[in-house]
From Swiss-Prot:
Keyword list, A-Z: Ribonucleoprotein, Ribosomal protein, RNA-binding, rRNA-binding
Subunit-structure text: Part of the 50S ribosomal subunit.
GO CC terms, sorted: ribonucleoprotein complex; ribosome
Gene Ontology MF: a single term: structural constituent of ribosome
Gene: rpmE
PANTHER family, per database record: 50S RIBOSOMAL PROTEIN L31, CHLOROPLASTIC (PTHR33280), LARGE RIBOSOMAL SUBUNIT PROTEIN BL31A (PTHR33280:SF6)
Taxon lineage: Bacteria, Pseudomonadati, Pseudomonadota, Alphaproteobacteria, Hyphomicrobiales
InterPro entries xref list: Ribosomal_bL28/bL31-like_sf, Ribosomal_bL31, Ribosomal_bL31_A, Ribosomal_bL31_sf
Keyword Electron transport: no
Function: Binds the 23S rRNA.
Xref: Pfam families: Ribosomal_L31
Entry's family note: Belongs to the bacterial ribosomal protein bL31 family. Type A subfamily.
Superkingdom per UniProt: Bacteria
Name the UniProt record assigns to this protein: Large ribosomal subunit protein bL31
Length: 73
């Protein structure tokens, strides 16, 4: 097996949309980094039955609707 080809694992903190936090090991970020989730199993329509609206934090949905809303598909 080749040496030094595998990514380093380290501990990060994950913050869910409701504010709950937990620590896990990941290759994402660096040691002690914080990952803030915009969508998680508690807020995703696939797991909540589709009744909850997605939050448009990045403005991507509104930008898409503004650009292509008049097509009337």
């Amino acid at each position: 097996m080749k040496a030094d080809i595998h990514p380093a694992y380290h501990t990060i903190k994950v913050v869910m949309t409701d504010g709950t936090e937990y620590e896990t090991r990941s290759t994402w970020g660096s040691e002690g980094a914080v990952m803030n989730l915009e969508i998680d199993p508690k807020s995703h329509p696939a797991w909540t039955g589709g009744n909850q609206q997605l939050m448009d934090r990045g403005g991507r949905v509104s930008k898409f609707n503004k650009r292509f809303g008049g097509l009337g598909l």
